[in-house]
Design a protein with these regions (language model features):
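Regulatory and interdomain segments flanking nucleotide-handling catalytic cores
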Residues: 1-234
């Protein structure tokens, strides 16, 4: 039986080859005789909230409605549910509710964080697994590596999720001061998660608290280690 490590490496090689050989992304969007989508520039499919949207944008907005999001269980929906139901916060979808001051002070921050040295951590795990491979019993060696890989993935997901929750908890504990400083209304949480997928994190927040939010997130993350290395992000 072949090594699962070799099989995974081969899959990633084929994936990279496919990405490198992808077709041109250029395409004709309009013939100049139709109404265009305000978001994508593609031909409009339907009027939605007084603006024209392509079918792509229309479907996305429909699925962004709360009642449909609730059907999809994921990290973001779990966090929003906990902080909404248990602590009464509202996670807005409107940037205007995050940008509480107008004019020169109307700034919003888009924060994107990515785990540091993840490739090195995975390579270290692979190297250690290689040393312990039993060529006479590859099935067992493969099962051990699969379990190790799952543990690695689960830990990354857990630690990054917990770091985000820790950040929100600090905002919660200081909400009166934060709310007064940012002029928040209706118990708005000044942070809106966009992506929480393993070590890929993206959220939108009021620009005044962006650096502090990042600092809180990274400090929480630094408390944990994977493959004998401290977790970090930038």
């Amino acid at each position: 039986k072949d090594s699962i490590i070799d099989a995974i490496d081969e899959i990633y090689k084929k994936l990279n080859d496919k990405k490198s050989a992808r077709a041109s992304v250029f395409r004709k969007k309009s013939y100049g005789i139709e109404q265009n989508c305000v978001t994508t520039g593609l031909p409009a499919y339907k009027r939605y909230d007084d603006v024209f949207l392509s079918r792509e944008s229309y479907v996305k907005r429909e699925w962004s409605k709360d009642e449909k999001q609730d059907k999809i269980k994921n990290t973001i929906s779990d966090i929003i549910k906990d902080f909404s139901e248990c602590k009464g916060y509202k996670f807005t979808k409107e940037l205007e509710e995050l940008i509480t001051e107008k004019g020169n002070n109307s700034y919003v921050a888009i924060v994107s964080l990515d785990g540091n040295k993840m490739g090195q951590k995975i390579q270290h795990m692979k190297d250690e697994a290689r040393k312990k491979e039993d060529k006479n019993n590859m099935a067992e060696s493969n099962n051990i590596y699969i379990a190790k890989l799952k543990e690695f993935s689960d830990n990354i997901k857990k630690y990054y999720k917990n770091a985000f929750i820790d950040m929100l908890n600090v905002i919660d504990k200081n909400y009166d001061k934060v709310s007064e400083s940012l002029k928040l209304k209706d118990n708005i949480m000044p942070v809106r998660p966009i992506i929480l997928a393993g070590d890929d994190v993206c959220f939108i927040c009021n620009a005044k608290i962006a650096l502090e939010c990042v600092s809180l997130f990274i400090k929480s993350l630094n408390k944990h280690s994977v493959e004998d290395e401290q977790l970090n992000a930038c």
